[in-house]
Amino acid sequence: MSYHYDGIPDIEIDLYWNKARNHLLKAQVECEESLKLLSTIRSEMDSCQKSRLKLQFILNCLVNQVEFFSSVILEKCIAVELLDNEWSKVVLVGVVKDLNYWQDEITNKINALKNTKYDLNAEYKSLADFICEDHVEILQQKLDEVPFIKKQVSNIRQHYKSIKEGVQYQLKAGKVKKLKKYYETHFSRDNHLFELLEGEYLTKLNSYESELTDYIRSITDHFDKCSILKADGLPPQDLKDLFEVVKNDDAELEHIRELIYESDAEITQFYKNVEGTITSIKENVADFYGLSTKIMVELEKCEEYVSIFQDIAKLVSVYKESCIRKIEQVQELCEVYDKFKKAYFNLLKERERRKSVAIQMKSILDECKGKLMALNEDDLDHRQQFLHENGDYLPENIWPGKIDDMTPLYSLEYTIYNEQK
């Protein structure tokens, strides 16, 4: 038998070292399994906490979506902007008022033309004979459509009221309120399941991890001391003191192993308890998703409701734009009719002016005719006097056809146009 130089048998040191090594290897395996289980538990507990935050996010999104649809889409965009302003005030009041005004205007303009007698000839009776009187129907057609538009707006207003009540009472006060209450009941920090996760379970989890770590550390420290003792690298007295420590610690190995065994059993049961709690939470999560899905289905229906309003809005918009174009057309016609009437009276003045000019021309021409006739008679007298004094002495061929010609030196033909009609 060999001994250390301090007198401690090598076989006894080897015995302690081998025993420490065996216990360390077994403890590492046992603790590793338990630590993996604890890691799984922690991961699932963290997952539950994340699920709660995710559900809170979903809840907030749904609440905001419903509130947005109710307050912005329904109340602001549809009720205020479409129903109250665009449809009721702009179209059914403003546009209809303009339609009636310009309908009266074009009717008055056409009547004014009818009442304006045409004096230029007998073919036409009044200025209205020169225009298309069907123009008076341009706006009347749009006015005839007003009752239909009013009915559509009235129907859509009732539809809006029904949707608003549905969103208010069935969705907001019903499904959303129920989802809020369900979340507060099952996912608030006061919920007993999450109190277990954040309180008792988390404390136990940390405690078990700490215990197992301490157990492994204790056995590892003992093994390290055995290895130092086996290496025989310390002074004799230090080795002797270390041997006593190893000897005393060796007596605790079995107890530590028993504690590890007990911890493993407790951790297994702890895992089952946590799994039961997590299963309950997952069931609650599934129920939450079921309730939230119902809300999302209702929101999809809300999108369909909006499409109905969009269709009516398009119909009213087309009607409004059509009315505006027709009103502009009638405005142009009214302006043309005014100018036509004014131009006609100017035409009458022009006729009178031309008549006056024709009279002046006739007077000038009559005066000219009288002077020409007098001058012609004087000319004839002079010709006859010439022939009497000289005709017998001049041969005919000296100015052929001219000497005894008594044709007047002028020819006056004219026409004065003085139209009365």
UniProtKB/Swiss-Prot annotation:
| Native source organism of the sequence | Kluyveromyces marxianus (strain DMKU3-1042 / BCC 29191 / NBRC 104275)
Question: Function, please?
Answer: Autophagy-specific protein that functions with ATG13, ATG29, and CIS1/ATG31 in response to autophagy-inducing signals as a scaffold to recruit other ATG proteins to organize pre-autophagosomal structure (PAS) formation. Modulates the timing and magnitude of the autophagy response, such as the size of the sequestering vesicles, through interacting with and regulating ATG1 kinase activity. Plays particularly a role in pexophagy and nucleophagy. With ATG13, is required for ATG1 activation by autophosphorylation. Recruits ATG9 to the pre-autophagosomal structure.
Q: Which GO terms describe its biological process?
A: autophagosome assembly; autophagy of mitochondrion; piecemeal microautophagy of the nucleus; protein transport
Q: Which GO terms describe its molecular function?
A: molecular adaptor activity; protein kinase activator activity
Gene null: resulting phenotype: Mislocalizes ATG8 in the cytosol, when ATG11 is also deleted.
Identify the coding gene.
Answer: ATG17
Q: What is this protein called?
A: Autophagy-related protein 17
Assembly information from the UniProt record: Forms a complex with ATG13, ATG29 and CIS1/ATG31. The ATG17-ATG29-ATG31 complex interacts with the ATG1-ATG13 complex. Forms a complex with SNX4 and ATG20. Interacts with ATG11.
Q: Where is the signal peptide?
A: none
Query: What does the sequence similarity comment in the record state about its family?
Result: Belongs to the ATG17 family.
The entry's cellular-component GO terms read: Atg1/ULK1 kinase complex; phagophore assembly site membrane
Question: Membrane: is it a keyword of this entry?
Answer: yes
| Main location (coarse class) | cytoplasm
Keyword Membrane present in the record's keywords: the answer is yes
Task: Give the way it sits in the membrane.
Answer: Peripheral membrane protein
Alphabetically list the UniProt keywords: Autophagy, Cytoplasm, Membrane, Protein transport, Transport
Query: Which InterPro entries does the UniProt entry name for this protein?
Result: Atg17, ATG17-like_dom
Instruction: From the Swiss-Prot or TrEMBL record, state where the protein is found.
Output: Cytoplasm; Preautophagosomal structure membrane
Q: What else is known?
A: Kluyveromyces marxianus proteins are shorter in length and have a more ordered secondary structure than their S.cerevisiae counterparts, which might contribute to the superior thermotolerance and solubility. K.marxianus could be therefore useful as a new model organism for further elucidation of the molecular details of autophagy.
